[in-house]
Amino acid sequence: IANGFYGLMCANSPATSQWSSFKSTCNYNTWVIGGVFCASMAFLEYDPDYYMTSVANSIRGLEYSVCGFAPSGGWVETPGYGDIAYHYLAHFTSTSEICFGSSFKLPQYQGMDKVSAWRTSMSGYDKTALIGDGSNTGATTDSVMYMDKYYGTDDYRAVRQEYVMSGHVQPELYDVLY
């Protein structure tokens, strides 16, 4: 697998890492660059210099994404797309803290600490307020609960607990972990 990725990861290409998509505030940026970050971490031992360049470029790219959060925690696109962005930023945060002992201050950007409250206000137990072409599925439980714990808030966890206790949703592993 490493041979398939080696030399082909677009975050390392000087031209591609300057491509506008890598400097975007859209959810696509967090999705793709979050994947490049995780793949780089998986293959880091094979060529540390190469893959650390991918890691550095990924972090730089994610700095553009976090600017998509409003001070209130809202997302520049729609609640559904915001959930995608938040989901991958939560995975980045947990992975980077485990691997590097740092989240590189990405969760400290404006509004990030209020996303959970915003997502909770936009979602019921199984649907999200549909705006534009975004999905109307409920919030991604693992990422929202992880970030609730990260910020020391109970915005989503408290509502989620009520949904579980009232029988509206089945408990998940994350209900126990967080």
Features from the language model and the residues they span:
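Carbohydrate-active enzyme catalytic cores, enriched for enzymes
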Residues: Y81-Y178
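Aromatic-lined, polymer-binding surfaces characteristic
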Residues: I1-S123
